[in-house]
């Protein structure tokens, strides 16, 4: 028996009928760029997360680039990020000519260390990117206080934390802009690349909306520098179906995580990353610390367990 890290087929069976029906409608309508499905997705996301604005984009990486551009990040600016994160957190900054500055993370939970962050702030610092790694969250209130005091933009890289709670609110509510990824393996995943930006600030939303589509105010009328970062309409159809079962999916993942914690917590050679008391994780990943990662991965592979 092979145990996969993600079982996409099982998830597909839960949405099969509704998805195939809506895809057929889309193909008959021949509307593949933005349109009704994308508008519906953005409405569904705002309702689910209780945010004012949602913007579908082409990937989680593009979501970060759009967010940074909307915040005016430019060449030689500095943006502080945790030193344990996915490469896109850093590369999105570098693609704009700015510099990612690495702050330490807490060894027990993998989130950005507040004191290390404070020590990295200088005159060139323009923004902080917080990362909800593996569904766990940093101390967003402390980060918000620091960013407000120092007049910095606070961006949430929530690629792995869609649906995670910070003190009874979804984590996408606490920052200037929050981003997520709908990569297939995510808690809310598409069947290709897709992502989204969220904000409660109208000016940032309107700027991001222009950036998403070549800086256009309207068709063929570009007013600022922009990207081709529109979400694929077919992927919007997929996510519209999957969001109907997202709460069930998060509950299922959390139940599986609890089984891992219960059955493996007595093994002294294995340590789990701690879930912070103010966080309710979306169950994105089960992450453990071991002395010899490569040896342990090899053993799990021999047992038919993907990592």
What are these regions (language model features)?
Residues 30-78, 92-96, 102-104, 169:
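Phosphate-binding glycine-rich loop
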Residues 55, 80, 101, 154-155, ...:
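Structural detector of well-ordered beta-strand residues that form the stable sheet scaffold
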Residues 56, 81, 102, 197, ...:
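Conserved SAM-binding loop
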Residues 69-158, 165:
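PLP-dependent aminotransferase-like
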Residues 92-93, 146, 170, 187, ...:
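Hydrophobic/aromatic ligand-binding patch that stacks against planar heteroaromatic rings
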Residues 156-191, 206, 218-223:
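Conserved active-site segment immediately N-terminal to the catalytic lysine
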């Amino acid at each position: 028996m092979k145990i996969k890290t993600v079982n996409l087929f099982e998830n597909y069976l839960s949405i099969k009928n509704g998805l195939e029906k809506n895809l057929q409608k889309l193909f008959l309508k021949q509307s593949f760029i933005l349109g009704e499905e994308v508008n519906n997705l953005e409405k569904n996301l705002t309702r689910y997360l209780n945010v004012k604005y949602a913007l579908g984009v082409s990937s989680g990486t593009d979501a970060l680039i759009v967010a940074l551009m909307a915040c005016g990040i430019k060449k030689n600016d500095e943006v502080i990020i945790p030193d344990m994160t996915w490469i896109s957190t850093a590369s999105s900054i570098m693609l704009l000519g700015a510099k990612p500055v690495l702050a330490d993370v807490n060894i027990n939970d993998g989130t950005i260390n507040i004191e290390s962050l404070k020590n990295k702030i200088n005159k060139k610092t323009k923004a902080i990117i917080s990362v909800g790694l593996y569904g766990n969250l940093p101390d967003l209130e402390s980060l918000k206080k620091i960013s407000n005091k120092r007049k910095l933009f606070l961006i949430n890289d929530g690629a792995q934390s869609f649906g995670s709670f910070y003190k009874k609110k979804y984590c996408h509510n606490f920052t200037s802009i929050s981003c997520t990824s709908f990569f297939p393996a995510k808690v809310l995943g598409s069947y290709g690349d897709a992502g989204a930006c969220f904000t409660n600030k109208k000016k940032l939303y309107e700027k991001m909306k222009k950036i998403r589509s070549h800086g256009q105010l309207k068709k063929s009328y570009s007013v600022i520098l922009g990207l081709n970062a529109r979400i694929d309409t077919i992927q919007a159809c997929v996510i519209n179906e999957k969001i109907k079962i997202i709460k069930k999916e998060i509950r299922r993942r959390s139940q599986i995580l609890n089984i891992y914690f219960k059955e493996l917590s007595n093994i002294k050679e294995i340590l789990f990353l701690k879930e912070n008391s103010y966080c309710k994780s979306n169950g994105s990943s089960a992450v453990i610390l071991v002395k010899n990662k490569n040896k342990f991965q090899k053993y799990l592979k021999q047992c038919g367990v993907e990592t």
